[in-house]
Amino acid sequence: AASADEADVYGFLNQPPVEQVRRIYTIDEVKRSSRLRDSVRRLEIGDLTFDTGKATISRNQVGSLSSVADAMQKMLQRNPGEVFLIEGHTDAVGSDVSNLVLSDQRASTVARILSDFYDIPPENLVTQGYGERYLKVKTEAAEPLNRRVVVKRITPLISYASAK
């Protein structure tokens, strides 16, 4: 989503899952199952950067969420029941436990910005941190590309109407 505009992001998030949805799942089932999460498209917020050990972003990075927020607003106008999963990730520096907490905080930071700055209703956002479990770059080093947030539209997995 680094330089994608709202129409590109909308088109991407609005695509059906990459495999057929077999049944309706709970949000907790989606959060726990990488197979389920991998069945929907992932949108990395490429312009967001987190410092090592930090869950905050600088004020000038808030704008990097505008195309994602605009696409979400458009989808919510069409279907107020849309649900988006905000995933937080860390690099491999630090303990597993501290990275899980940090990744949760990163996901929550992005969800809060989407709600506070872009008026995305909090009830349409679900957050989950995965720590260092899903490294983008396989390294134990402090790799900035691993300190990221991913947005997924999980509505087709949790809603009968959208799974048809």
Segments from the language model and where they lie:
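Periplasmic peptidoglycan-binding/tethering modules of Gram-negative envelope proteins
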Residues: 1-83, 155-164
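Periplasmic OmpA-like peptidoglycan-binding domain that tethers envelope proteins to the cell wall
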Residues: 59-62, 87-164
